[in-house]
Amino acid sequence: MKLQRFSSLPLLVVLLCAPASAQTGDIYSKKSVRAVMQKVFEWQVAHPVEIDALNNNLWARAAFYAGVMSAGRSTGDRRYFEQATRWAESRNWKLGDRPRHADDHAAGQTFLELYVLRKEPARLANTKSVIDAMVAAPRPGREDWWWCDALFMAPPVLARLYAVTGDRKYLDFLDAMWWDTTDFLYDPSEGLYYRDKNFLNKLNANGRKVFWARGNGWVMGGTVRVLQRLPKNHPTRARYVKLLQTMAASVARVQGEDGRWHPSLLDPAEAPVPETSSTGFFTYALAWGVNNRILERKTYLPVIRRGWAGLVASVNEEGKLGWVQRIGLAPDKVTADDNQEYGSGALLLAGSEMLKLK
């Protein structure tokens, strides 16, 4: 596959002007990757984003802790698990207030992974109760998971509930919902997802289809996190694998030359700036695909390495990850000062897979 990357001189200048710590030494060494992960983790915990603590944005912090848990597993550093436990305890191991809203389910990913580490009933009870009620009264995916971000928020919770209970009803529900949402929002001609119905059959001011980078990052990250718990013999596993492969090819073609993706995947001119939350999720998904022999190493390793370099260049000396598009629903402007917890979570997910690359 021939990869076509968008070139932008301002982005190259940004990369060249990145902190010296991001450009010295081997940024791909395990020591360096661990150091960047720890620095970003520590800075983000010390500088919580105020709005992320609100219930209606519980997902933003939940996405951070998905990365924290992954970092704990990949590094063996229990400080990640300890911090995740403190957060879960502050939530009383409870999901958000909206029982059918995927955003309010995202925290369950961390709760369930902590339950595996210590099987205390309180760690499982609320997540299982909320999801059981939803499974008992199913609706189409396009109704409950009507925006593509939802495919990161809720499906990995269902996959993890299956893993801890062995009850296939969670996989059956996940599968039906996922593919109905996909039939609704996926554009097979582009191998990408629209954010929601408002972008179907709609062109931007430049006459291009609008595929939001972070939205597709959510989908690729969610696909990986479902595959992690989906049995090898599951009847539709090959379909998830094919989806990951197709999306990987689509996003690789539009990677910026500095390694970071633009907010609008098919039209970098719509928002001609780098965006790091999408870069983190794409790098994570591509690296996981290579590590699990789903994606071709020769094709994707250069893409992954550029993605990681772009992320590292976006971390300042203190550990703040910049260039994270704010909470929104479409491509938008981003600055070097913009930070959100889900961006740091995406970097931790990517770093966790970078540590496994050979």
Residue spans for each PLM region:
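Bacterial N-terminal signal peptides
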Residues: 8-18
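CBM-like carbohydrate-recognition segments
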Residues: 23-62, 69-90, 94-127, 261-262, ...
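Conserved H-X4-D acyltransferase segment
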Residues: 68, 158
